[in-house]
Amino acid sequence: MSKRKLTQNQQRRIQSNNAKTLHRHQHRHKSDIDWQDDMLGDFQDGTVVTRYAVHADVENEQGEIIRCNLRRTLKSVVVGDRVVWRKGKEQLQGVRGVIEAVQPRHNQIVRPDYYDGLKPIAANIDRIIIVSAVLPNLSLNIIDRYLVVCESSNIPAVIVVNKADLLSSEARIEVGLQLEIYRKIGYETLLISAKSGENMEKLTALLSEGTSIFVGQSGVGKSSLINYILPEVNAQTGKLSQVSGLGQHTTTSSRLYHLSQGGNLIDSPGIREFGLWHLDREQITNGYREFQYFLGTCKFRDCKHLHDPGCAIQLAVKEGKIDPLRFENYHRLITSLSETKSQRHFISAN
């Protein structure tokens, strides 16, 4: 009996897992450096600007970048974390310091992982930039998934649609109508092109305050946007899969960049499936900001806002107060939540 042929995605996943295992095996001694007190300097404040498998790059108050080990007692360290660290009196195996503690986070972005439970991505974020693209098509369902995460994390969101240069006149009108759905409920939107430069000045101005993070599926052009905003970084850009239209992951670790006009930008690895399995039904419902005015006014207290009689949300949809596409996506999220909850269980992130 012949073996089943693996898809390109399956082959890449196997290769990636194999590479990670080899990396951990070859470098495990590096993470086991036994830093004694007499080998370290004074305690200092710093910010994590890059996170690797067993190390992190920390920026001190003078702007110097130091590669550090992590104390085994630390549960998680992510880009954007404000940490307490100590510099080694000498460099050991390419490492110059150790992170001793993580300051309390103002907020964090997490995503569920099938094997590791909830996995933090970044911390202390002022703004989430949801990057989508007009090709292969503009997915409002994926945008809504990201918005639920933004609302549950209490982090402001901006919707950015890239590759506007590929739009015909008719398609541009259609995308404009789709974005109007979000503008009506208070979200800022931008239709841009990293290739032609359309509206890139507006995006750059938006990033000039606080710390922003780009999130979005692979292939939407996050790396191309970073190349435009920070040409000196020369982030690697990936080629779209001819089969699926989804791009291969081109960023291997989360990084924080300082922008010349002010502000910081975090780029994180692409996420093809941004799961919401760690959220319950109530959290997803609260993730739809236009629902808030009507919640608590349904006929029945346990209304699920699906096919229940006397549902105030359904009535608002019929009266044009809630967009039907958003309500349809809500149905999809709740259905997928019910299906996944029966299969998976996720632990809390710390």
From Swiss-Prot:
Domain CP-type G: 106-274
Region (Disordered): 1-30
Highest taxon above the source species: Bacteria
Keywords assigned: Cytoplasm, GTP-binding, Hydrolase, Metal-binding, Nucleotide-binding, Ribosome biogenesis, RNA-binding, rRNA-binding, Zinc
Positions bound to GTP: N162, K163, A164, D165, G216, Q217, S218, G219, V220, G221, K222, S223, S224
Chief location bin: cytoplasm
Cofactor: Zn(2+)
GO CC list: cytoplasm
Amino acids binding Zn(2+): C298, C303, H305, C311
GO biological process: ribosomal small subunit biogenesis
Alphabetical list of CDD domains matching this protein: YjeQ_EngC
EC number: 3.6.1.-
UniProt remark on cofactor binding: Binds 1 zinc ion per subunit.
Family: Belongs to the TRAFAC class YlqF/YawG GTPase family. RsgA subfamily.
SUBUNIT field: Monomer. Associates with 30S ribosomal subunit, binds 16S rRNA.
Function, in words: One of several proteins that assist in the late maturation steps of the functional core of the 30S ribosomal subunit. Helps release RbfA from mature subunits. May play a role in the assembly of ribosomal proteins into the subunit. Circularly permuted GTPase that catalyzes slow GTP hydrolysis, GTPase activity is stimulated by the 30S ribosomal subunit.
Official protein name in the record: Small ribosomal subunit biogenesis GTPase RsgA
Species the sequence originates in: Histophilus somni (strain 2336)
Gene name as annotated: rsgA
